[in-house]
């Protein structure tokens, strides 16, 4: 069965490529050679679908040789009592260090460009 992609991931992929082209223009048309994305567990993004969309959109373009690295960012919380940051393994947000329930979101909802490598023209 062929890999399916969603409109959500296609829209994100299009936005990523627009951002890469804008960065290239800011650097005098430097060629983008690698780009990294950090996608959070809670972002709602299907990573393999996003990868497929990116590869499909760059085929036969100036970005065809671009290498993408997609990093998964787990759902984490920070304890307000002891400052520990811990991965959430279920819906119970208790601190794994001290047991406090006074916690706040620390990560896992992000969707960001984490790095960019350019080759000057």
Language-model region placement:
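Short cysteine-rich clusters marking metal-coordination/redox-active sites
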Residues: 79-82, 95-98
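Short functional micro-motifs and their immediate structural scaffolds
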Residues: 87, 103-104
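Long, charged N-terminal interaction/targeting segments
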Residues: 1-64
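Short linear interaction segments
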Residues: 107-108
């Amino acid at each position: 069965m062929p890999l399916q992609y969603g409109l959500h991931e296609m829209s994100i992929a299009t936005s990523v490529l627009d951002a890469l082209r804008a960065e290239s223009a800011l650097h005098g048309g430097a060629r983008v050679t690698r780009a990294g994305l950090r996608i959070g567990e809670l972002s709602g993004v299907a990573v393999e679908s996003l990868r497929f969309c990116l590869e499909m959109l760059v085929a036969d373009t100036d970005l065809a040789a671009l290498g993408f690295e997609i990093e998964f960012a787990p759902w984490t919380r920070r304890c307000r009592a002891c400052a520990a940051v811990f991965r959430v393994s279920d819906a119970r947000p208790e601190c794994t260090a001290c047991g406090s329930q006074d916690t706040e979101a620390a990560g896992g909802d992000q969707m960001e460009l984490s790095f960019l490598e350019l080759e000057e023209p």
